[in-house]
A protein has these predicted regions:
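Flexible "arm" and connector segments at domain edges
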Residues: 1-63, 67-155
Length: 155
């Protein structure tokens, strides 16, 4: 896949049209926060409509618009300079949901069964074991899952 440079492209738009780009992580004024949430909700509604209409062109448009508005929010919340590091930490955390061994996967299945009766199944692919909830095929976190530590990055 080709790499996307959405933050810098949207920063160009913000600079051109005078939209805020904050240099330090912060929560903007309530009206700006409400605008950001409203814009994201609007684009998400367009995605839902495009999916319902089975219209791939409109799906692509909605996804691009969501990425554009989301990138604008990252800039307006002053997260632009730290976003790669933040995203990489979320990626690391998400990947820790996978199990490194069949034993870890079996312990994970037992953990969910003992915790609340959740039935799970193990799937191995390329030396990685994944645990899925049987009811809906949702990925379940390994017993060795490690949550993202975004706080240390934002300090």
């Amino acid at each position: 896949m080709e790499k996307l440079d959405s933050l810098n492209q949207v920063a160009q738009f913000h600079t051109t049209f005078g939209a805020p780009i904050l240099t330090q992580p912060t929560i903007p004024a309530a009206e700006r926060c409400n605008l950001r949430v409203s814009l994201l909700a609007e684009e998400l509604d367009e995605l839902k409509e495009a999916i319902a209409a089975n219209d791939l062109v409109e799906v692509a448009d909605a996804l691009c618009d969501l990425q554009y508005v989301l990138s604008g929010a990252v800039l307006e919340f002053g997260l632009g300079e730290k976003f790669v590091e933040l995203f990489n930490e979320v990626q690391r955390s998400n990947m820790s949901k996978a199990c490194a061994s069949i034993e870890e996967a079996e312990y994970t299945v037992k953990f969910y069964q003992d915790k609340d009766g959740t039935e799970a199944e193990i799937k191995e692919e390329n030396g990685v074991w994944k645990v899925y909830r049987k009811a809906d095929n949702k990925v379940l976190k390994s017993i060795n899952y490690s949550p993202a530590d975004l706080k240390s990055i934002l300090k």
